[in-house]
Amino acid sequence: MSDTLFPCGQLLSAGLFTDQSPFEKRVLMCKKSKRPQKRYFFITKRQSGKVGTNMQEVNLIVQSKGGCGKTFCCASYAQYVAARAANQVEVHCYDTDTSNRTLSRYKPLHVQVINILTRDNNVDIRNFDGLVEQFLEKDGIGIVDTGSNTFIPLMSYIAENNIAELLRESGVRLILHVPIEGGQAQVDCIESLGRILNDVDAEVVVWLNEFHGAVENAGKPFEQFGVYQKHKDRIIGIVRVEKRNPDTYGKDIEQMTKLHLTFDEVDATTEMTFMPKQRLRNVKRDIFAKLESLPVMANALNGGDDGK
């Protein structure tokens, strides 16, 4: 790992890159990015250098609206990152969803459950302290599934404790992944996205879940929404989960999530026949292809153009 890229956030002016430093600056521009003019700074370890003890990138999947495909997006992203980066850095997955611990049931992801409930089943937001400390103590990439019932206290915790700034100053890049579901839930999802962008100074990846309909307003696509136009400099990517036939693909995805199987486990299971497996391979191929365009650490580790 003598030539590995790591995100440096806003550390360019923090004196990190000195003659004595084990790090040197690079600039990443993903080859498949639709916004090639935007530059993302990373650091690369020199031959004699040693990566710091904190994580280099933390991904929080957040949305106040329940049932919008949040855990599916989180599980898909975790599988993608593990496939792309696990041989080069550690990938840490966490489940903080108090009402529906779904991600932790995906055994190959080795998910750690973060219990933020008291004995009376009330949310004790102080328990997030331990999670933040793990961000600062462990090396690699973090992926966190959060619950809709903890959205408000979590956003308050991040804002009140200046978590985004704390992580940035510690060399940890924070990325928020926000699923938006089309159909009846769209208005609530968009309002949640707006609050996230207003309250937290971090980069955002938007997932457009079209299972219940396209994400649009009066015929206008998401890219023309006011919330996107206002914050597009911080929205670093859009992942579109396309609507598919609910009688085939829909039921296949439902069965896969009900069994808590990863895409790789689907290929090995005896509980699905050939055609459902083939359709789920198509879903995996489509989602992974779209994730390749994101300017994230997993892609930087695998041949992203460093701009030199």
Where are these regions (language model features)?
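Polybasic, lysine-rich low-complexity intrinsically disordered segments
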Residues: 21, 25-26, 32-33, 38-41, ...
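P-loop NTP-binding site
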Residues: 56, 205-213, 220-308
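Residue-identity detector for glycine
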Residues: 9, 15, 49-52
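Nucleotide-state-sensitive switch-loop elements of NTP-binding domains
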Residues: 56-60, 86, 90-151
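Conserved catalytic-core segment of NTP-binding enzymes
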Residues: 150-251
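Walker A/P-loop phosphate-binding motif and the immediately C-terminal alpha-helix
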Residues: 59-93
